[in-house]
Amino acid sequence: MTVYHFVGIKGTGMSPLAQILHDTGYTVQGSDIEKHIFTQKALEERNIKILPFDPDNIQPGMTVIAGNAFPDTHPEIERALSEGIPVIRYHKFLGEYMDSFTNVAITGAHGKTSTTGLLAHVMQSAKPTSYLIGDGSGMGKENSEYFVFEACEYRRHFLSYHPDYAIMTNIDFDHPDYFSDIDDVFDAFQNMALQVKKAIIACGDDEHLPKIQAKVPVVYYGFNEENDFQARNVVKNTEGTTFDVFVRNTFYDTFYIPAYGNHNVLNSLAVIALCHYESIDVELIKGALTTFGGVKRRFNEKVVGAQVLIDDYAHHPTEIEVTIEAARQKYPDREIVAVFQPHTFTRTQQFLSEFADSLKKADYVYLCDIFGSARENIGKLSIEDLREKIPQAQLIAEEDTSVLKAHKDGILIFMGAGDIQKYLRAYEKVAV
């Protein structure tokens, strides 16, 4: 049997794919940078070998799965190609692998990781389900009937997939280093829609999704009356959210989620609609929704003294806004403090005013230096450009986070897609 070698095994898609193959009986190893990344914990728990990059890692009899971030000139990939060892790109491998299951792609500008995690959790309570989540979580079951996976629109990678079902949470302009404008993003989703084989579950409240053309039924969900699956009578409190679901204006059932904010109601509606389409018992759906513990880096809370520290991946103005909204629902009488690290210079430049507007919804704002991704080295702007747009915003450095102690019973939300967790960990050390 071949050994699967992952070039870039700590990637948020690569790590869960390695976990899935390992769980289903394959021999798996991989290589990556030596810096610790949160996605490696699940690999280490399975004793999956993680090696430093080295062309000598490549041996006869292997199949190389290459991460999207690594060009054909990467030393390991070069070695494999020169020795005739098969090299398959991550998204191509995944596209072929999923064909042996009833598979569901979850895509959208925002909410796809949380929705993938929620759907995997609910489906597992009904049928054997394998899943791949963009928070680095993956699980393979040998007898799986379903495969639930997160599909990213960046660089149109999701066009490698021809899923049975697609959940589309929303369309928004992001990844300005690749997409030129919202029309370019819409075009990518439109092409994806034409590749779906059974049905699309799409948010009808979204500005763009109702314009999607498809060869299969499109089932819409949302708060508005024209949706096929509609949430009504929404009751929010500090314990979570309860809502009624109407299917084409007929009462279906009442659901409770231990989650906050309208975006989590919408994510749940998407899952309810898909499960209804697959004839999963409503009592199973209701029960599983109440026990979902969330996904990594999405509103993860930790109590430190009188403060609550929240770690969240929010890195787009829309995501910042809904994260602050969720915190206000759960902690209506507490001070909300945003600690934000912008992710990539191109995104910060593109959305400078929108970032300022969304962050102003917090009571206090602290800004970390911009995190440049592997895709770019230097930008034309600095964090000062954002600070100037937010009155009273302060800059904060990893070396000195003690200023946050002033917010004695505050809700501190650390947001960003870079290494904002460094700031959170630094503050934890001085907080008590």
From Swiss-Prot:
GO terms, biological process:
cell division; cell wall organization; peptidoglycan biosynthetic process; regulation of cell shape
User: What InterPro entries does the annotation carry?
Assistant: Mur-like_cat_sf, Mur_ligase_C, Mur_ligase_C_dom_sf, Mur_ligase_cen, Mur_ligase_N, MurCDEF_pg_biosynth, UDP-N-AcMur_Ala_ligase_MurC
**So what EC number does this one have?**
6.3.2.8
Signal peptide annotation: none
Q: Which residues participate in ATP binding?
A: 108-114
Q: Gene3D superfamilies of this UniProt entry? A: Mur ligase, C-terminal domain (3.90.190.20), Mur-like, catalytic domain (3.40.1190.10), NAD(P)-binding Rossmann-like Domain (3.40.50.720)
**Record keywords:** ATP-binding, Cell cycle, Cell division, Cell shape, Cell wall biogenesis/degradation, Cytoplasm, Ligase, Nucleotide-binding, Peptidoglycan synthesis
- Gene Ontology annotations for the cellular component aspect, listed alphabetically: cytoplasm
Its UniProt pathway annotation is: Cell wall biogenesis; peptidoglycan biosynthesis
Recorded coiled-coil stretches? none
Q: What class of enzyme is it?
A: ligase
- Membrane-spanning parts: none
Please state the protein's primary subcellular location.
Answer: cytoplasm
Q: Which reaction does it catalyse?
A: UDP-N-acetyl-alpha-D-muramate + L-alanine + ATP = UDP-N-acetyl-alpha-D-muramoyl-L-alanine + ADP + phosphate + H(+)
- Where is this protein localized, as stated in its record? Cytoplasm
Instruction: Please give the Gene Ontology molecular function terms for this protein.
Output: ATP binding; UDP-N-acetylmuramate-L-alanine ligase activity
By sequence similarity, the record places it as follows: Belongs to the MurCDEF family.
PANTHER family tied to this protein: UDP-N-ACETYLMURAMATE--L-ALANINE LIGASE, UDP-N-ACETYLMURAMATE--L-ALANINE LIGASE-RELATED
Q: Known NCBIfam families for this protein?
A: murC
Role: Cell wall formation.
Q: What is this protein called?
A: UDP-N-acetylmuramate--L-alanine ligase
Organism annotation:
Bacillus pumilus (strain SAFR-032)
What gene is behind this protein? murC
